[in-house]
């Protein structure tokens, strides 16, 4: 995915505010052998680009002053209640250095699985994106998780996920095999045809003679 940015000279709170008032979003691109570069991007174009999954999880081609460099999105700051981008950060990447990025998981085949189709289970994804490290050329836009073979007794953890060649998952914490989904069995309704159990009769009280 390609986008156009423009070099900016002024920085600071006042300059950024004036930039946003003119319909531009301030940003920075850093990393690699070159120095950090201040940039500005058309706010509306950036706003719509940020709605696309691919803009967050793939190598982007950024054009500045007629020169194109490969970058990844690293951070976006939004206004607390306005539809306004305050600042955006990009990092340069090169073909010889591995990148660390979050990649979305696409769950497929859920409705065709025995767990859902036959056993009426509810399958809930627990993880929606995965930290991965790989070479830029091997970075997938997303990772497909096939759920079509699941039954009510199935489990699916990270170690059971087939990753593309050259892609390695980054796991933090002591749990090296976190669950990716949960499977909930259907609730069993009480049998309405069963005869209610009669309560034992209370003993009769003896009257005075």
UniProtKB/Swiss-Prot annotation:
Keyword annotations from UniProtKB, A to Z: Ribonucleoprotein, Ribosomal protein, RNA-binding, rRNA-binding
RNA-binding as UniProt keyword: yes
Gene Ontology cellular component list: cytosolic large ribosomal subunit
Domain of life of the source: Bacteria
GO molecular function, one term: structural constituent of ribosome
GO process annotations (BP): translation
Family matches, as InterPro entries: Rbsml_bL25/Gln-tRNA_synth_N, Ribosomal_bL25/Gln-tRNA_synth, Ribosomal_bL25_b-dom, Ribosomal_bL25_C, Ribosomal_bL25_long, Ribosomal_bL25_short, Ribosomal_L25_dom, Ribosomal_uL5_bac-type
Region feature Disordered, mapped onto this chain: 190-209
Family: Belongs to the bacterial ribosomal protein bL25 family. CTC subfamily.
Record text on subunit structure and interactions: Part of the 50S ribosomal subunit; part of the 5S rRNA/L5/L18/L25 subcomplex. Contacts the 5S rRNA. Binds to the 5S rRNA independently of L5 and L18.
Function: This is one of the proteins that binds to the 5S RNA in the ribosome where it forms part of the central protuberance.
Name of this chain's protein: Large ribosomal subunit protein bL25
Organism: Delftia acidovorans (strain DSM 14801 / SPH-1)
Phylogenetic placement of the source organism: Bacteria, Pseudomonadati, Pseudomonadota, Betaproteobacteria, Burkholderiales
């Amino acid at each position: 995915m390609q986008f156009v940015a423009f070099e900016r000279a002024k920085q600071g709170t006042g300059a950024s505010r004036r930039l946003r008032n003119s319909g531009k979003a301030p940003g920075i691109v850093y990393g690699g052998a070159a120095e950090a570069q201040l940039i500005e991007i058309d706010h509306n174009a950036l706003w719509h680009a940020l709605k696309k999954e691919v803009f967050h999880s793939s190598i982007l081609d950024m054009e500045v002053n007629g020169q194109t460099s490969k970058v990844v999105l690293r951070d976006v700051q939004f206004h607390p209640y306005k539809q306004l981008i305050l600042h955006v950060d990009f990092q340069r990447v090169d073909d010889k250095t591995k990148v660390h990025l979050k990649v979305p998981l696409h769950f497929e085949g859920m409705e065709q699985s025995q767990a859902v189709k036959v056993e009426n289970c509810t399958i809930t994804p627990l993880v929606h994106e995965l930290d991965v490290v790989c070479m830029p050329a091997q970075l997938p836009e997303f990772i497909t998780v096939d759920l079509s073979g699941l039954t009510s007794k199935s489990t699916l953890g990270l170690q059971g996920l087939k990753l593309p060649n050259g892609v390695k998952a980054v796991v933090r914490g002591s749990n090296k095999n976190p669950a990716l989904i949960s499977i909930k069995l259907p609730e069993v309704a009480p049998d309405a045809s069963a005869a209610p159990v009669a309560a034992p009769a209370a003993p009769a009280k003896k009257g005075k003679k």
